[in-house]
Amino acid sequence: MANIAAYKKGWERTLRREKALQEKRRAEALKIAEGLRDILVQEFKVSRVILFGSVLKKHGFDMDSDIDIAVEGLAKKSYFKAVARLMMQSQFPVDLKPMEDVRESVRKRIAKGVALYEERASS
């Protein structure tokens, strides 16, 4: 039985380390997402930036996760330039979704996200 107890303790330690690493990666991704927001707003003049997906889930951001960002107001001709620019600034893959082009199923996932930026209407 001693071998099983030692194995269990070792496995629990490994799981705690993995969970801590995942949370650290998630915190880094959230910080990077703020910088990506700034690029999208300042360089590409988008009117709205929404963070969604696994990065918002406390235990959902794993080693294979990306940063999911939806935007409104991105010129179609600027899409690939924006993706390239974001990828250069991020150690994580970035999945950029123009709201004007997404399917309803994706829209529902985006609706559960967090707005990082919304252009104020001028009065």
Residue spans for each PLM region:
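Catalytic core of pol beta-like nucleotidyltransferases
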Residues: M1-K45, K57-M63, G73-S123
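Glycine-rich beta-strand-to-loop/alpha-helix junction loops that act as flexible
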Residues: L51-S54
